[in-house]
Structure formats: C-alpha cells, structure tokens
Amino acid sequence: MQEYKPFKEGKVREVYDNGDSLIIVATDRISAFDHILRNEITKKGAILTQMSKFWFDFTKDIVPNHMLSVDVNDMPEFFRNERFDGNSMMCKKLEMLPIECIVRGYITGSGWASYQENGTVCGIKLPEGLVESDKLPEPIYTPSTKAEIGLHDENISFEQSVEVLEKIYPGKGADYAAQIRDNTIALYKKCAEYALSKGIIIADTKFEFGLDENGNVVLGDEMLTPDSSRFWPLEGYEAGKSQPSFDKQFVRDWLKANPDNELLLPEEVVIKTVDKYKEAFELLTGTKFES
C-alpha cells in the first residue's frame, strides 16, 4: 500500500497530493487568534467536512467548486480507514488566489470596533446610528490577504485586491477580482436566506477561490462552516448587544477572559464547542450528525 504524507499543513487542515487531485483532511485541531490550541475538538473535522459538502452541493448553480468526493472508497487505500473516514474530501487541484473573500451581513467583531471608531468597516462608509449586531442594509465585501501561520491576515480594499491579482495575472486582475467579489456576495445572499429559514443567522463568512486548468474561477477551501463563519441563533436575536453563537466565538470569549490560558481549554469548553458545531450542522442540513 502506498504511504501518503501531507505536503501542506494549515492550522487545522492537512493536504495530500493524489496525482490529478488533492485530498484535504479536516483535523480536530482548533485555532483562535491565529494560534493553534493544544486541545482537539472531537469530531470537529467530520462536522466541517460534511457541512462543506452540503453547501458545495447547495451552491453549485452559482459557481463551480472543487469537491469531487467525500467517500473514502473513491480515494487510495491509505485513506480507507477510521482516521480519514468522514473528515476527508477529494478535490480538484486549483491555483488558489491569494485573497480571503470576506462578506459581512451584520456588524460585529472587528467590524463593529472599527465602525465605533470612524463609521467605517474596512474603509467602507456605513450609515450612521448602527448598533452592535445590526443587519447591514446590504452585505459588504471586505477582502483580506492570506497570512502564513503565526501572522495576521491584513484587510485590503477591493482596489488593492485588483492590484494584488494584477501583479500575478497581468491583464486579468480586475476581472478575477470582480468575479470573486460578485460570487462571494451571491453565495452569501443565497445561503444566508436559506439559513434564516432554518433558524440561523449567518453574520459573516469567508470564501476562497482558485483557478482551474482553463483559468476559470472555482470555489475552493471550506464553505460556511463554524470555523469560517459566524452563526447566530435567530431565536433571541436582538441588535444592540453581542449574540450567542454556534461557532468558535465560545472559544474566543474564553481565551479573552483567561489571558494566561497557555492555549489550553478546559474540558467543559471543549464539550460545549462540539455541541454547538453539531447543533449548527443539524439545523442547517436537516440531518442528524452521525459520528
């Protein structure tokens, strides 16, 4: 049996080369504030993979995506075991664009802090009088650069995203930048409307895109998971305060409240985080998470 080693390890993912495809494995690691924590969140990788699959299927009419299969029987023998079953996705190879495509439908987090300071979010002027967690009149696109592990992503304007892409793809930067912006907004609008019907507000999220062998823009990475998004319960939503969430915010809040944490979470925080991820999965997909 051929052995495989990841050629790329991100904060929470491992990527294996499978010839004409990639196998992306979502681990149970969790990161916050650009650091990898010492705990693992049981079954987190499987929940994220199955949730991405759901959204990729749901949005393939808007933009093609990189997913080929989540069935380990379609993968080499090395992956056909408990370690990889459920948390692995075989994907098309893409040349990833170096832009994180962030879309915000509600004002919260760093966006809220910036708005309080100067009435803008990532340089975009917003109406006066907004309160924390308010729904924005229209979703806003706030791209950022992709940072290496240990470094912070940097917010950039749309115009700067054009410049970044133009340097790599002369004559095509403006077109690619517009395509990923327009796809980001379209994906968010469709999915946010659907999620609302299931009792979940998608406050914000991020997408990543790449180019296939023909230079077409394709959606890659993960999609609308609790790792890449802020999910709030619709029940009890009230603008003017921070909201409870189904995502990593629970972990972030604990780390902020315990600055001497040494990146180690107490067991009850781990259990609550798993429960939140599962609840979000089951509400959104309408299926029970089978661990």
Name every feature range the model reports, one short phrase each.
Residues S21, M96-P98, K198-I202, N214-V217:
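Coil-to-beta-strand transition motifs
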Residues V103, I202-M223:
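Conserved metal-phosphate-binding beta-hairpin within the catalytic cores
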Residues Y169-A203:
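A long amphipathic alpha-helix within ATP-dependent nucleotide-binding catalytic cores
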Residues F33, W112-A113, N214, S228-R230:
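Intrinsically disordered, low-complexity acidic/polar segments
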Residues E14-N18, I200-A203, F207:
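Hydrophobic/aromatic-rich, well-ordered segments within soluble, folded domains that form packed cores
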Residues M1-E148, N261-S291:
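Active-site loop/lid in soluble adenylation, ligation, and acyl-transfer enzymes
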Residues E117-D175, L219, M223-L284:
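Anionic ligand-binding catalytic core segments
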